[in-house]
C-alpha cells in the first residue's frame, strides 16, 4: 500500500497547508483578511471534503478590521463552520479595481487557495470586477458560484463554460443577462437553468438595499449549496493545480442529503474489547417506517485509506442516486481510526447482519458494496471472501495488488486461492471503475500490464466465476484495454471539457459478470456520474438468501 499511503500523506499535507495558511508562503498583499474553519475529528455534521472557499471582493479597499467587519455583516459564520469553509477578503491591487491587474491577482490567490469549491462574492465595484473580468473569461470554468451585488453588467463572451450565479441589487436584471446567456439557461420557475446541466443556474433578485446577511442566506440556500466545482482531470485533485493548468473544472452536486429527502443516522456500537464501531446510515425518509418487508436494497460504501467515513456518501454520487431511486446507504468506518475500531471483513459482515435484523424492510437478496481506493480494494476482496453476503460488488481506483499485504488487506495469492476453490460454484458480479490518469493506483499500458492491480482483480473474478482468464493482452484489439470487451460503449459526459467513460463487459454465457469502466484522463478519485453507471449494473443482480445462488434479472 506504499503508493496509496504516499498519496494520502500528500493529501494530508495539502489539507494541512490549506488549514494552516500562516505556515504557507505569504498571502498576496491584496488579501486583507483570511479566515479558515477547518474542524477535523467531529462525528456530527459533514466531512471536510469539497469544503467551500469564499473570495469576497469589496466595493473599495478595506483595512483588516473593516474586512473582518464585512465578513461579520454577511453573518456567514454558521455556514463557514458547518462546511469547514475558508474566506478571503481581497482588495483591488491599486486604489481602484483594474481588470488586468486584479485578474492576475485573482490567479495568484486561486493558486494558493487550491479550492475545489470556490464561491466568488462581489459588492459594488467589486461586483463590477467579477462581472466584467472573471465571469466572461475562462475564470468562469474555475468558479463554483458567483454572488454579485449592485455591480455593472459584463459582456456576453463568445464562448464560456458557464458559471452558476446569484444576481441581486441595483441593475440586477441587466447584470443577469450575460450570465443567463453564457449559461445557455432558460427560465424554469423562479430561476434560469441550462437544460443539459441543471447546476448551471442563474437566480435573479431585484431587491435593492437588502442586508448582506439576508442576501447571503438566500444565495447560499438557492445557489451556493447546490454544487461544487473541482478538477480531477489529468491529475488527482488533492495534489493541487495552478490556474488554467488542467482546463475547466467539473460541476458536481454538493451533497446535502436532507435536500434529497434522505435522513442520516449516526451509529456508534460499543465493543467488548477495543474501540467502538462507527457507521452512517442514509435513509430515504419514507422507507424508514412504511416500506414492505425485504423491499429496500442495501448499498454499502467503504472510504479510502484514512479518509473520513463520510467521504463516499458525500463524494461518490451514490447519495444522489439513492435520492432518485430510493435505496438504503450505509458508510462504515471499516478501517478504524484513533477513536473508532477497525471492522475488517468480518466486522463489515456483522454490521450488515445487525442492519438486516434491525430493519426488516431491508432486502437481504440485494446487498451491494462499493469503495474508493483502499475501500475499493476492500470491496473487491469482500466479493470473494464474503460472496454469500453480496449480490454484486465494485470499486473506484483499486483492485488487487500483487505481493504480500499487511493489516486489513488480503494478498493476491490468498484471494486467488479462494477464487480457485470456489471456481464455477460461486458467481459474483464485479464492477471496476478506474481513472486512466491515476498515478496512485495506476492503470496499465502495453508495457506494464503484467501484475497490474486492475487486471489482477478482473482475472480473479474470472477465475471464481468460472470464466476464461485473460492473461495476455493485445492492444491491436482495443487500444485502451488491450482485450476484447463485449458491448463496448463510449459515454461522453457534460463534465469539464466532456470527460468520457469507456465501458464494456466480460460475459459468462448470457450473464455480464464483470463490468469495466475507464474514466479517460481522470485521476485517483470518484467520478460522480459513474455511480449511476455502477448502480444500473448492480440492480441486474440479486442473491437468493437461502441457496446463496446468484440471480440475473437481465439488462
Where are the predicted features?
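Sec-dependent signal peptide recognition
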Residues: 2-10
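Loop/turn elements at helix/coil->beta-strand transitions in domains of secreted/extracellular proteins
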Residues: 49-54, 83-87, 114-119, 139-145, ...
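Short substrate-entry loop that stabilizes the transition state in hydrolases
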Residues: 48-51, 56-97, 287-342, 402-403, ...
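A domain-start/cap signature at the N-terminus of enzymes
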Residues: 18-53, 83-86, 91-94, 100-104, ...
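Alpha/beta-hydrolase active-site loop
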Residues: 93-120, 131-132, 338-361, 365, ...
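The feature captures the conserved acid-bearing segment of alpha/beta-hydrolase catalytic domains
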Residues: 139-197, 392, 397-510, 524
Amino acid at each position: 500500500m506504499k503508493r496509496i499511503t504516499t498519496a494520502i500523506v500528500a493529501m494530508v499535507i495539502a489539507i494541512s497547508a490549506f488549514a494552516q495558511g500562516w505556515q504557507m508562503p505569504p498571502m498576496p498583499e491584496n488579501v486583507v483578511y483570511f479566515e479558515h474553519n477547518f474542524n477535523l475529528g467531529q462525528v456530527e455534521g459533514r466531512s471536510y471534503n469539497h469544503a467551500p472557499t469564499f473570495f469576497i471582493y469589496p466595493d473599495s479597499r478595506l483595512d483588516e478590521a473593516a474586512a473582518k467587519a464585512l465578513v461579520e455583516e454577511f453573518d456567514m459564520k454558521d455556514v463557514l463552520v458547518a462546511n469547514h469553509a475558508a474566506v478571503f477578503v481581497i482588495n483591488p491591487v491599486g486604489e481602484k479595481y483594474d481588470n488586468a491587474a486584479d485578474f492576475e491577482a485573482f490567479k495568484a490567490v486561486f493558486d494558493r487557495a487550491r479550492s475545489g469549491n470556490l464561491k466568488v462574492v462581489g459588492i459594488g465595484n467589486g461586483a463590477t470586477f467579477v462581472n466584467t473580468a472573471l465571469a466572461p473569461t475562462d475564470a468562469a470554468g474555475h468558479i463554483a458560484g458567483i454572488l454579485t451585488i449592485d455591480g455593472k453588467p459584463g459582456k456576453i463572451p463568445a464562448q464560456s463554460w458557464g458559471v452558476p450565479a446569484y444576481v441581486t441589487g441595483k441593475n440586477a436584471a441587466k447584470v443577469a443577462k450575460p450570465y443567463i446567456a453564457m449559461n445557455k439557461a432558460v427560465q424554469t420557475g423562479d430561476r434560469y437553468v441550462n437544460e443539459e446541466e441543471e447546476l448551471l443556474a442563474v437566480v435573479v433578485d431585484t431587491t435593492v438595499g437588502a442586508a448582506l446577511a439576508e442576501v447571503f442566506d438566500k444565495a447560499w440556500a438557492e445557489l451556493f449549496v447546490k454544487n461544487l466545482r473541482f478538477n480531477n482531470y489529468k491529475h488527482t485533485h488533492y495534489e493541487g493545480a495552478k490556474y488554467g493548468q488542467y482546463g475547466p473544472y467539473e460541476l458536481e452536486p454538493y451533497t446535502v442529503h436532507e435536500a434529497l429527502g434522505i435522513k442520516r443516522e449516526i451509529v456508534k456500537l460499543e465493543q467488548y474489547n477495543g474501540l467502538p464501531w462507527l457507521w452512517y446510515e442514509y435513509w430515504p425518509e419514507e422507507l424508514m417506517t412504511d416500506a414492505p418487508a425485504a423491499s429496500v436494497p442495501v448499498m454499502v460504501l467503504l472510504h479510502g485509506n484514512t479518509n473520513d467515513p463520510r467521504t463516499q456518501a458525500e463524494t461518490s454520487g451514490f447519495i444522489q442516486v439513492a435520492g432518485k431511486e430510493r435505496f438504503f446507504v450505509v458508510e462504515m468506518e471499516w478501517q478504524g481510526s484513533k477513536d473508532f475500531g477497525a471492522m475488517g471483513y468480518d466486522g463489515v459482515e456483522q454490521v450488515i447482519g445487525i442492519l438486516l435484523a434491525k430493519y426488516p424492510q431491508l432486502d437481504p437478496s440485494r446487498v451491494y458494496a462499493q469503495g474508493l481506493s483502499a475501500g475499493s480494494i476492500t470491496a473487491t476482496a469482500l466479493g470473494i471472501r464474503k460472496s454469500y453476503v453480496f449480490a454484486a460488488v465494485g470499486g473506484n481506483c483499486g483492485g488487487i495488488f500483487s505481493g504480500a499485504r499487511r493489516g486489513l488487506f488480503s494478498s493476491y495469492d490468498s484471494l486467488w486461492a479462494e477464487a480457485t476453490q470456489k471456481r464455477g460454484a460461486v458467481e459474483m458480479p464485479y464492477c471496476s471503475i478506474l481513472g486512466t490518469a491515476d498515478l496512485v493506483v495506476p492503470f496499465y499500458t502495453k508495457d506494464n500490464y503484467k501484475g497490474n492491480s486492475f487486471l489482477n482483480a478482473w482475472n480473479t473474478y474470472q477465475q471464481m466465476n468460472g470464466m476464461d482468464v485473460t492473461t495476455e493482452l493485445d492492444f491491436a484489439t482495443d487500444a485502451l484495454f488491450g482485450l476484447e470487451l463485449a458491448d463496448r460503449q463510449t459515454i461522453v459526459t457534460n463534465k469539464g471539457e466532456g470527460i468520457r467513460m469507456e465501458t464494456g463487459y466480460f460475459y459468462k454465457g448470457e450473464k455480464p459478470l464483470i463490468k469495466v469502466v475507464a474514466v479517460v484522463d481522470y485521476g485517483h478519485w470518484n467520478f460522480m456520474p459513474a455511480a449511476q453507471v455502477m448502480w444500473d449494473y448492480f440492480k441486474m443482480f440479486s442473491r437468493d438468501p437461502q441457496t446463496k445462488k446468484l440471480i440475473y434479472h437481465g439488462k
